[in-house]
Amino acid sequence: MFEYVKDLGLKPARPYTRRKMTDLIVLHHFAADASPEEVHRYHIGRGHKGIDYNVVVLLDGSAARGRGMAYAGGHVLNSGASRGMNARSVGIACQGNFDVRPMPAAQKGMLFRVIRDC
């Protein structure tokens, strides 16, 4: 499973925490055409362990490993009603900004595949 997700070799600034359970999937978009590597560097620059998402779905319809499926993400603000969601959710981010243009069909197809395999 997830053999189609390419490993970009993104190294965390600090070790990731293993996720013990999964009962949520949270979808995001970058709000930019930034690469996963750029987002990884940006998140580290903000004091995060590394890229906050478990998987990234690219505009071309491919998928790339973020933190990986075994680890807790950092993709949900950890306060109020969302407290603790990172420890129990898979964070899937899509490259692009869908406020300015629609998601390409190939990307949408891969997003559905990743969700199905979660």
Predicted features along the sequence, with ranges:
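Active-site-adjacent loop/helix surface patches within enzyme catalytic domains
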Residues: 1-118
